[in-house]
C-alpha cells in the first residue's frame, strides 16, 4: 500500500511573533529513525514526496515548510529571514516532537541550515546529507538568486504559471509531464484575486542581498 502522509503544524517563535510552521509527516510516528528533509530557498516540503514515500517503511520522514514558504506563516519583519531564524525554528520543531536525533537531508538552503546546526555543540544531527550546495557561494550567484526571488509576479492561469516555472527549472532535465506537475504544483498558490503566484514570501530575497560572501 502507498504510505500516507500527515499534514501537521507546530508553533515556533521569531523574535517578535509566534509562527505556525507546517510540515508533512510520513511513516511510523513512533519510529526512532527520523529523516528530516529541508528544502531549497523558494521551495517547500512537498519537494520530498516521492523520496518520502520510498523511505517511509524504514524511516519517519519529516518535511517542513521553512517559515515564509508553503503553508507556513510569513514573518512580519523580513529582516528575520535567514539561517539563524530557520535553524532555531527547526530545532524547535524537533524539540516539540520529542526527537533528539535525526538524519538530515538538505537541498541547497536546507543544506546550509544543516551545516549551521551541525556546527553547534550537542546538536541532533547524526548524519548530514548535502544536495546541491557546498561551503562556498559566489557573490554573483547570490545577486542572481536575489533578483529572481524578489520579484512579486503573478499569472492569470495555472498553465501560464507552470509554463514559466518550467523555464526556471529547465536545468533539472527532461522530466515527464507528471514529474513536472509533482515538482511545480505544491509550490504554486492561487491568491484571493484568482491570480497564481509562487508559494513563498518574495521578501525572503532581502536577507540574500545583505550577505557578503567574502
What do these predicted regions represent?
Residues 125, 133-160:
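A catalytic-pocket lid/entrance helix-loop region that shapes and gates access to the active site
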Residues 1-36, 57-59, 99-100:
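Alpha/beta-hydrolase fold catalytic core
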Residues 15-19, 24, 50-53, 63-105:
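Active-site loop/oxyanion-hole signature of alpha/beta-hydrolase fold enzymes
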Residues 40-50, 61:
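Serine-hydrolase catalytic-loop signature spanning alpha/beta hydrolases and amidase-signature enzymes
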